[in-house]
Amino acid sequence: MSSVKRRKTDKNPSLEGLKSKKTKESKKESHTPSPEPIEDTEDNRVIEETEEAEEDDAPKSFKDLGIVDSLCEACDTLGYKAPTPIQRESIPLALQGRDLIGLAETGSGKTAAFALPILQALLDKPQPLFGLVLAPTRELAYQISQQFEALGSVIRVKCAVIVGGMDMVPQSIALGKKPHIIVATPGRLLDHLENTKGFSLRSLKYLVMDEADRLLDLDFGPILDKILKVLPRERRTYLFSATISSKVESLQRASLKDPLRVSISSNKYQTVSTLIQNYIFIPLIHKDTYLIYLLNEFAGQSAIIFTRTVNETQRIAILLRTLGFGAIPLHGQLSQSSRLGALNKFRAGSREILVATDVAARGLDIPSVDVVLNYDVPQDSKTYIHRVGRTARAGKSGHAISVVTQYDLEIFMRIEAALGKKQVEYPTVKDEVMVFKPRVEEAQRHARNEMKNLHEDRGKKGAVLKGRRPANGAKRGRDEMDREEG
């Protein structure tokens, strides 16, 4: 399909008019209550660290931060030329033996910020079962493990990934080999702590809770409480999160000792300066046609399309493949091997478009993403931040476009209010967009038939795809898979 040249058009007056009518109401409803203040007690002191130092005074290398030569060489090998702000602020404090709360925007280098101090401590005093990292999703757990192994290759660090959806027997064998680092989702780790003979974390030295806000969003709180009770009190604990909430504050009070807070983002809902953010305001009936138009506008670039449901993820992937796009779906109803396969194909460039539910929105390191398309507007500002954080990473530029229909306006205005910034409408010409309509309608018919066959083939499994509640009546989360991590 040929690319369509873009022409500038005036902003859609109907959207601006609707926005102005709703501004008062939006301001009221978008107000988010602040977390409860943290008492400044001796056991629970939080010191704000901000990125206000002059650039000339900032450490220029990992060696300047106190990282040993062997780990600095690993950083060089991986292409880490200079520490990121979160690494500059947190690593020296971690090397001093302090507990940390790290708050930074997505794509800021948080993993290396906690991995390097742990590896340096392990190098100084080697022992098995040295560190534990808890992550909300399987993909993030595998990614963290890969980064630990890459950074720790010079000291031959051994990692074990313990996640739900996999056979427990090989995991028990891996734990029996006493790895240095365990990276786990909370539910499956608790299974092993309760059921795997001889497995204990009594000698653990370091605990990391990564993406802590999402761990709590997914109702892992009670499981975390049980895990914390069996860990030694004399340990170092790092809590990393893109956002702060009252739940996260409660978790840090329960798990950290005299922590320091490293906060890089000045805004609760901060996006990086290299990210271009736009929207298009369109009728719902033409949503697919405008999506194809946008993909042609960004032809040859890698893109993630975010949808709200598993059903839409499947349908759009079929629609795009019918039209000749290299698209692959990623959602919670896929098997673990299928999900990892989808990610690997996208990373390798054999598929240029990933169609995903919010399971892909947090923590996945896909450096080559050029464009994020919010086919469905996210339901809250935090989800928006984490979606668009898939592009414009590590100083690179990126583009995010939200498809806003007449039914999404109020939510979108709340997101704008939280960001503190009005977005600019992406210029489109309706006549040029409608050129795609006949082929899109044909592809839609094909996708409907494929989805019907898919539902029939899957039988009971199709109940989730059709949006029904799970049989056990469990509350549905942002993505069904995330609730099955244990």
UniProtKB/Swiss-Prot annotation:
Q: GO MF terms on file?
A: ATP binding; ATP hydrolysis activity; RNA binding; RNA helicase activity
Give the catalysed reaction(s), semicolon-separated: ATP + H2O = ADP + phosphate + H(+)
Task: Write the Enzyme Commission number(s) for this entry.
Answer: 3.6.4.13
Would the keyword rRNA processing be found if you checked this record's keyword annotation? yes
Domain Helicase C-terminal intervals: 286-434
Motif position, Q motif? 60-88
In this protein, which residues make up the domain named Helicase ATP-binding? 91-262
| Primary subcellular site in the record, as a coarse category | nucleus
Q: Which residue ranges have biased composition labelled Basic and acidic residues?
A: 447-460, 476-486
Q: Which GO terms describe its cellular component?
A: cytosol; nucleus
Its BP terms in the Gene Ontology are: rRNA processing
Which Gene3D superfamilies does this entry report, sorted A to Z? P-loop containing nucleotide triphosphate hydrolases
**Binding sites annotated in the UniProt record for ATP:** 104-111
Q: Which family does it belong to?
A: Belongs to the DEAD box helicase family. DDX47/RRP3 subfamily.
Subunit details: Interacts with the SSU processome.
- What is this protein's function per UniProt? ATP-dependent rRNA helicase required for pre-ribosomal RNA processing. Involved in the maturation of the 35S-pre-rRNA and to its cleavage to mature 18S rRNA.
State the name under which the record lists this protein: ATP-dependent rRNA helicase rrp3
- Origin species, per record, is Botryotinia fuckeliana (strain B05.10)
